């Protein structure tokens, strides 16, 4: 649980939110650099990104590294609850779930788990056989969502470039990845930004290393030159993910 925030201004970097205390919740490291995000952080990230009641209906949202669906399940739940506030048309709700909620995951087992979780959730409302727009594929190679998303949310994979094997060259082809010993999560910022439409919002939880590292230079310059950072929630030295030693920031880009 997020207990207290203090707010400070930091010039063109937007608002800096410093958290003093968060609940201690165990989560697991996921292979391919992903970690499972606890519910309380998912809710904070979605709220920070303004994916909230009254701002959800017929808005495109994607988690481009969805894992087993931790974010997507919350997104579907919010979409369903928001829809029922103005309509009881189950057929139309099914159509909208298929149209406006998107996901990508490279691990087939994980994407299948995500689908199963979402199916179980909506079946409670009498909705069956949803043709989810969830793709089992490599996000680095997918551009069909570019310039279309109202919301991009998630917890990108943390993988150092020297551990990327076959994806090394793909990562280095990205502006944000073409500098120093980069990390895959940095490239996911570039991918996420490209997915946004003109009024879209990106809300990620990631390590804070890009603020000071050589590998984060291109990303920092791009964000500052284009005045993209709306807010940052800095978890400081609190270890939100107990099995890691990263310092974490929640970043909102608009």
Language-model features: locations:
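Conserved beta-strand segments of alpha/beta enzyme cores
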Residues: 100, 131-133, 228-231
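Signature of N6-adenine DNA methyltransferases within the class I
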Residues: 30-31, 35-44, 65-73, 80, ...
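Short, structurally constrained coil/turn elements
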Residues: 55, 95, 128, 225-228
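Hydrophobic "anchor" residues on beta-strands that sit immediately upstream
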Residues: 59, 101, 134, 151
